[in-house]
Amino acid sequence: MNWKLIFQLSLFGLFMGIATVFVIPSKIEPLFWLAIFLLCAYIIAKQVPDKHFVHGLMVSIVNSAWITTAHILLFSQYAANHQQEVEMMKSMPLSPRAMMALMGPVVGIVSGLVLGIFAFVAGKLVKPRLPARA
């Protein structure tokens, strides 16, 4: 496993966690994620010789930690810009922050399955970068 690459690619999650609080509206957020997933899948396929699916899965799980943390820490600002999501959370048995903390990892796993599939397919289509010769 290339943990350095997983961490580096997960920084898209940190960016999106903050950007979705302040800049990116919910309606267009999926387009950003599609672009990020395609880019991550390509990079994984280029940089990693095998286990593409697992690398994609792990990137999304780490992404979910960044995003969940950002949304919980910036909850007041998140709530001001995402009223529809907050309204949905009000009907849940736990507080909105607790629901975010519980659902964040679930979303990370589900999105990780998607990114994992993208990375697996990219691994079949993209030739990996050859290691430098000594």
Regions flagged by a language model, labelled:
Residues M1-A134:
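Juxtamembrane/disordered regions of integral membrane proteins
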